[in-house]
């Protein structure tokens, strides 16, 4: 959480208009049912929470079984959203996944912390500590799936 202390009042932005209507495709497709109602995510059920934010040594079994190969976050709700279908593809080299990310496998469990740090340099994925990457990979190997 952050703060900005100002001596001037700011005019707040207008709230974003919901375009969802009666659509609940994201709710239907969430593998862990973390989206409990429109605009409400129960974080302890969310794959993204468990693979990026959680500092627990293990991923709960009920989440682990639903990982579906996700090692760093989960974009299923974004992938199925009809509004995201019209967003143009960003071909910027800075936003493309690095090759090593596409090839995470059992061998990456042997990487030392220095190798992880080198690979993650300049990436927001460095938020995921090396031991967490290993935890997430191992959880997916148990289910024979890896995806990022």
What are the roles of these predicted feature ranges?
Residues 1-29, 33, 39-40, 49, ...:
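Ferredoxin-type iron-sulfur electron-transfer modules and their immediate structural context
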Residues 118-121, 126-144:
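Long, compositionally biased charged/polar accessory segments in the mid-to-C-terminal portions
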Residues 148:
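Long C-terminal interaction/binding lobes of large macromolecular proteins
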Residues 25-51, 55, 67-97:
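Iron-sulfur cluster-binding cysteine motifs and their immediate structural context
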Residues 2, 44, 123:
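Flexible, active-site-adjacent loop/turn segments at secondary-structure boundaries
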């Amino acid at each position: 959480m952050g703060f900005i202390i100002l001596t001037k009042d700011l005019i707040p932005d207008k709230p974003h208009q919901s375009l969802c209507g009666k659509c609940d495709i994201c709710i239907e497709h969430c593998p862990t049912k973390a989206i409990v109602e429109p605009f409400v995510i129960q974080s302890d059920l969310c794959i993204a929470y468990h693979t990026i934010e959680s500092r627990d040594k293990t991923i709960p079994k009920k989440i682990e079984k639903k990982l579906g190969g996700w090692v760093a976050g989960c974009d299923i709700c974004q992938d199925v959203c009809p509004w995201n279908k019209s967003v143009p593809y960003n071909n910027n080299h800075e936003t493309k996944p690095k090759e090593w990310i596409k090839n995470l496998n059992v061998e990456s469990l042997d990487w030392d912390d220095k190798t992880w740090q080198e690979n993650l340099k300049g990436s927001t994925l460095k938020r995921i500590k090396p031991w967490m990457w290993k935890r997430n990979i191992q959880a997916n190997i148990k289910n024979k799936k890896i995806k990022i």
